[in-house]
A protein has these predicted regions:
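Short, glycine-biased loop/turn motifs at secondary-structure junctions and
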Residues: 1-228
């Protein structure tokens, strides 16, 4: 399907096509933004990214359309999808959050996160406390006078997304794990959409941050699909 990817869900392709709807068409499924062929966790993440992370349809299409072929074969077992939820959380904490912190000239705090081990099912009860302590440094360490005016509120967005992802991941157990996995995916999507609404700053700065975020997001999806 060679057409622009658009915002939101649609009744049919004549109205428009988002990333997940394009996947349903590519897979030969009924037209839907919840195709069976796509991993539940990645589908939850990318539905929100499709709608929040882009300034225009051209950017959305350029970044997301190359992912379609790999996504339509990403449906997997519960264990694999849980592993992907862990990856989304770790990417938010160890990639997106440090990027946001360095934007605010908080490199020392970024290094604190980068020195922490990735969260796993085996260590989450102990290591999540270390992440929460590091998040507290952000909450109390941001000086309004030091924040570039055009980035106001963006670090707060990533901070809240990271905090929410940890909370949801720590509760991802039992028969209702998908509810928490979906919350992880939504939090990660918000973190990866942190600069999409900023149109007040230096265009070159905003463009650089946005393209850097897109590159990380594409890498994240490719790594997630590779988990089998």
């Amino acid at each position: 399907m060679n057409r622009l990817l658009t915002f939101g869900s649609h009744k049919n392709a004549d109205e428009g096509v988002c990333l997940l709807e394009a996947c349903s068409v590519r897979a030969g499924e009924p037209f839907s933004d919840r195709p069976d062929s796509v991993c539940f966790v990645l589908s939850s993440f990318l539905r929100k990214v499709n709608d929040l992370a882009f300034f225009d349809d051209e950017s959305r299409t350029r970044v997301l359309s190359p992912l379609i072929d790999s996504l339509v074969s990403s449906s997997a077992s519960d264990d694999v999808q849980k592993a992907r939820a862990y990856l989304l959380t770790n990417s938010t904490l160890l990639e997106m959050l440090p990027l946001a912190l360095r934007t605010y000239s908080m490199s020392n705090t970024a290094e604190v996160f980068e020195a922490l081990p990735p969260l796993t099912p085996e260590n989450i009860e102990t290591v999540s406390g270390q992440y929460k302590a590091a998040l507290a440094q952000i909450k109390h360490g941001v000086s309004v006078d030091e924040v570039p005016p055009h980035l106001g509120g963006l670090l707060t967005l990533v901070y809240r997304a990271a905090k929410g992802a940890i909370k949801a991941l720590s509760q991802m157990n039992g028969s209702l794990w998908k509810y928490q996995a979906e919350e992880v995916a939504l939090c990660a999507a918000h973190a990866y959409s942190w600069v999409s609404d900023d149109d007040e700053g230096d265009p070159d700065v905003v463009r650089g941050l946005t393209e850097g975020t897109y590159s990380l997001m594409v890498s994240l999806v490719n790594r997630a699909v590779a988990i089998r």
